[in-house]
């Protein structure tokens, strides 16, 4: 029996090795990885640039403390601010921690402005922001809230993509609006074209901060460095993680100078956040993603995946309903349990991940090749053709 806490319904396979877009189990069987560790393995498995960055840094310094300046941390922060709207960065170890830092930054900002009564954060139905007590308080998804009540009474939830509902939900106690540009766990549902712009306008009107949770959408996943670029909207704060480390744990809260003005010494901290190993690897990830032509290639690969999904929907409308999402962050709505379909696809050598009850996520490494996309289509078709007798 495993000594691990039973917090995951783990598949009965041991993944022992990864290379590029492929995973291998204990029996040597290969799996085309269209999950990428849930949008984490930006450059696939074992990318030599990341391996070298980690080895080089490991020979120099693993950990000191955030009580000192750390060159690897300063270098990564500068790369992030040079490439984005942000002026300041706080480093953490995960997406949930990055969102926590974003919430604290917004509340601290309101307090520094002399408005401590503004502490509530407006969030949206079917959102997912992490599994800490604060971040599960920020969602209405009962599957992550169950058993943890009473939760923090600091969030107000309104329907996603309903700008009029958001306007009505703002009160004199509202400090900020927290939203995913594309809901990840919520079924790969994108914000409608005017929704994020409408939220930006509401924040400007009511002197609130706009926080974007780009934990899953960031670092090139949509074909842009961050998904808010698709919408032409400038946030005040974003939470980043997953793809930033390419498989090495790191999170970050990025903010404008004004939004970060309340974060003074002692207001927040992290023992391991921004450690040299994580920052060295994340710097190598950013160098690759920001290299000329990389994001253009991601968009080209995304177009091939779109065409693949259209063919799949035409040939197997008995199983697949529709596709949604952007770039290499795609969701397939299915006429069955998403978890059952994910298990079935795994039997045919394709790794995917569920999003809610009836959506299967396709989140391949951004380095997936045209040949691998063709192989993905072949395996998905074989799996879909074999589904009928199972469902009958």
From Swiss-Prot:
Its EC number is 2.6.1.11. Keywords: Amino-acid biosynthesis, Aminotransferase, Arginine biosynthesis, Cytoplasm, Pyridoxal phosphate, Transferase. Pathway: Amino-acid biosynthesis; L-arginine biosynthesis; N(2)-acetyl-L-ornithine from L-glutamate: step 4/4. It is an enzyme of class 2 (transferase). Its main location: cytoplasm. Pyridoxal 5'-phosphate binds at residues 95-96, 128, 213-216, 271. InterPro entries: AcOrn/SuccOrn_fam (IPR004636), Aminotrans_3 (IPR005814), Aminotrans_3_PPA_site (IPR049704), Class-III_PLP-dep_AT (IPR050103), PyrdxlP-dep_Trfase (IPR015424), PyrdxlP-dep_Trfase_major (IPR015421), PyrdxlP-dep_Trfase_small (IPR015422). Disulfide bonds: none annotated. GO terms for biological process: L-arginine biosynthetic process. GO terms for molecular function: identical protein binding; N2-acetyl-L-ornithine:2-oxoglutarate 5-aminotransferase activity; pyridoxal phosphate binding. It is found in: Cytoplasm. It catalyses: N(2)-acetyl-L-ornithine + 2-oxoglutarate = N-acetyl-L-glutamate 5-semialdehyde + L-glutamate. GO terms for cellular component: cytoplasm. The keyword Transcription does not apply. The modification N6-(pyridoxal phosphate)lysine is found at residue 242. May also have succinyldiaminopimelate aminotransferase activity, thus carrying out the corresponding step in lysine biosynthesis. Homodimer. HAMAP family: ArgD_aminotrans_3. This is Acetylornithine aminotransferase 1.
